[in-house]
Curated annotation (Swiss-Prot):
The gene is speE. This is Polyamine aminopropyltransferase. GO terms for cellular component: cytosol. Residues 9-238 form the PABS domain. Catalyzes the irreversible transfer of a propylamine group from the amino donor S-adenosylmethioninamine (decarboxy-AdoMet) to putrescine (1,4-diaminobutane) to yield spermidine. It comes from Shigella sonnei (strain Ss046). The keyword Cytoplasm applies.
Length: 288
């Protein structure tokens, strides 16, 4: 039996993970990026950019449920949602499940990524691009939040790691723009990497966000594809109460929403804000 081809992730120099490649569906390598989508028997379709896994069919639901339902149910009455990035459509898919949301704006810098993901990752968007509440804006995320006249109740930054094109979505200019177009009491969330291996990224986000929001913290979820520990999500708002809502309040909102999830539930929501001591200590050591 012929040995299967392997794809190795290159995010870290000293260690990593690999996937067996059953079938390469797409591979484009240019001076600017290396994009590949392949099939793996354990994880389904896998998309990687510049040597780093971005999403897989098998476990994407964990990431996307936690990035949408945590802020939306904590807010309680969000009407207008902004997604920065998210061209694969899975974040949009989860937001559309909230029937009280009236408008969903997605800002994607690459016009081709939506059609590309429609073709190669159809299970991610599950038809959500056709939702009448959805509007796609082709623009740089930093430019959009600093120029738009729209305001939002929840902003979800579905950014890549802070290298290359994704670096601008971890800057003070971006965070300031997000604060500018958030409605009072609005919530901003963003992926912040695997904290055990990328702690400096979390601390940097904490410092910068604290200049613009009165309540800044993190919540976490275990996502197998993002190896090295627990995935960390930044949380920022000026409504200090929203991070500390009781499980009973979240439970009532969850039941009223009619959501049926595979990972998220009200107990997970509450528990996600319990941070490991090493991260608590690192955040506590930052100047106020």
């Amino acid at each position: 039996m012929a040995e299967k081809k392997q794809w190795h992730e290159t995010l870290h120099d000293q260690f990593g993970q690999y996937f067996a490649v059953d079938n390469v569906l797409y591979h484009e390598k240019t001076d600017h990026q290396d994009l590949i989508i392949f099939e793996n028997a354990a994880f389904g379709r896998v998309m990687a950019l510049d040597g780093v896994v971005q999403t897989t069919e098998r476990d994407e639901f964990i990431y996307h449920e936690m990035m949408t339902h945590v802020p939306l149910l904590a807010h309680g009455h969000a009407k207008h949602v902004l997604i920065i990035g998210g061209g694969d459509g899975a974040m949009l898919r989860e937001v559309t499940r909230h029937k009280n949301v009236e408008s969903i704006t997605m800002v994607e810098i690459d016009a081709g990524i939506v059609s590309f993901c429609r073709q190669y990752l159809p299970n991610h968007n599950a038809g959500s691009y056709d939702d009448p509440r959805f509007k796609l804006v082709i623009d740089d995320g930093v430019n959009f939040v600093n120029q738009t006249s729209q305001t939002f109740d929840v902003i979800i930054s579905d950014c890549t790691d802070p290298i290359g094109p994704g670096e601008s979505l971890f800057t003070s200019a971006f965070y300031e723009g997000c604060k500018r177009c958030l409605n009072p009491g609005g919530i901003f969330v963003a992926q912040n990497g695997v904290c055990f291996l990328q702690q400096e990224e979390a601390i940097d986000s904490y410092r910068k966000l604290s200049h613009y929001f009165s309540d800044v913290g993190f919540y976490q979820a275990a996502i197998p594809t993002y190896y090295g520990g627990i995935m960390t999500f930044a949380w920022a708002t000026d409504n200090d109460a929203l991070r500390h809502l009781s499980t009973e309040i979240i439970q009532a909102r969850f039941l009223a929403s009619g959501l049926k999830c595979r990972y998220y539930n009200p107990a997970i929501h509450t528990a996600a804000f319990a941070l490991p001591q090493y991260l608590q200590d690192a955040l506590a050591s930052q100047p106020s």
